[in-house]
Amino acid sequence: KTVFSWSMYDFANQPFTTLIVTFIFSAYYTQAIAPDIHNGTFLWSIGIAITALFVAFISPLMGALADQGGYRKILLIFWSWICILSTIFLFFTYEGQIYIALFWFVIANIGFEMGSVFCNAYLPHIAPKDKIGRISGYGWSLGYVGGLIALMISLFLFVQPHKPIFNLKKNSSINNIPV
């Protein structure tokens, strides 16, 4: 039960990277929010780099806190909420808001990455030493399943419908994602 619960974090969390970082919002940012695809791709890359640098510098400190044990759960929840709330703000960005959208993306991506630090810190405590690799792979595979399900739902309900879902106008940000 504990291993399944731990794995479900990946199932629920992986759609962020699938939808926001890789397929849907990244395309929307580079092709609709940014003035052109070249500037959009450049700025998106800058956002990824900022996230990577921040995570590289702060992860050792956060990892030490996670290893202490007492902060693991509260910081997992904290960083997860940072990701969730920042991702919600992405919904409200539209054409021309290149820096606002990039700001919320970077904050959300940092929240995602730092949440992963604390999720991963649980693994040695829930898995026997000889099964850590197998259990880690189980979580990883459930993450991919979650990401694929979220991608299919997004494509069929939001990106490619002939009639917009939830009565959203066809040119609203959620239905204006180029694929």
Question: Which positions does each model-derived feature cover?
Answer:
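Helix-loop boundary and gating motifs at the non-cytosolic
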Residues: K1-A52, I98-L102
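Central cavity-lining transmembrane alpha-helices of secondary-active solute carriers
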Residues: I20, I24, T41-L65, L85-S86, ...
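Transmembrane alpha-helix termini and helix-breaking/packing motifs in multi-pass membrane transporters
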Residues: T22-I33, G147-V179
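Helix-to-coil boundary motifs at intracellular loop junctions of multi-pass secondary transporters
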Residues: A32, Q68-G69, Y122-I126
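Loop-to-transmembrane helix entry/capping segments in MFS-fold secondary transporters
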Residues: H38-F42, K129-W140
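Cytoplasmic membrane-interface "Motif A"-like loop-to-helix N-cap segments
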Residues: A66-I82
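Hydrophobic core of transmembrane alpha-helices in multi-pass small-molecule transporters
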Residues: S80-F118, Y122
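Glycine-rich segments within core transmembrane alpha-helices of 12-TM secondary carriers
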Residues: E113, G133-V159
